[in-house]
Amino acid sequence: MLNAFIIVWRESLEAMLVIGVLLSWIARQPAPAPLRRRLWLGVAAGLSLACALGAGTFAVQSEFAGASLDVFQLAMVLTAAALIMHMVLWMHRHGRHMKRELEGRAGAWGIAAIAALAVGREGAETVVFLYGLGLESQGMALAGLSGAAAAGLAAAGATAWLAARGARLLNYRTLFAASEILLLCIANALLANAADRAIALGWLPALIDPLWDLSTWLADGQGAGRLLADFTGYRARPAATLVLASLAFWAYALWRLKRPATAAPGA
């Protein structure tokens, strides 16, 4: 449930920040009313796109059975992990310049397009993430997942409101840096779940299984161990393949995060 809350909070916050930047720009224009209408038209289009993707995902799933369903579900979990990685890396590189870039692209229909793409992209990613989390939890109750998503949306609204009011206690850079680590932990948990599934189905060799056994000290089926398993991909008795996959994931993520941004031409 915590994973769903964090994902919806972060995704919704990004969309709200984009809308907030555009509203701020619109308020400074001589005729803001038509621009504001275009903005909300774009938001509605983005929400429609996200809803269509959600309906399409479940419609496609209903067409699969047996091995085909296993492939589809595994692909969705891996897609969710990859999208989280992409989102973290993109925001890490572009987040500090987002306000200037958005205002530079703003225009009558440009506002609608930016809003539609922002809301549609974040909404579509959220659909994939929540679907992947539902598979990871092996049938997480719909009510619990919906409640966590609603709480994440409310928290994003509160965070955006605080940011708009210039709350001194809200350090945006620290907030996003912490959320990057949290989201990468969730992505690694999805990757671990996908590796477990692939090994169980015989699609990946386990190599050494288990590579070690920490179940006596911290079992992953209950209490703190279960929380770590759901949130970070911790396994008390991991297969060597899973450990290698996680090491590769974190090595790539840290390398990309630490890599200096490419200088703009002519800078």
Model-assigned labels for residue ranges:
Residues 1-267:
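Multi-pass alpha-helical transmembrane bundle typical of ion/small-solute transporters
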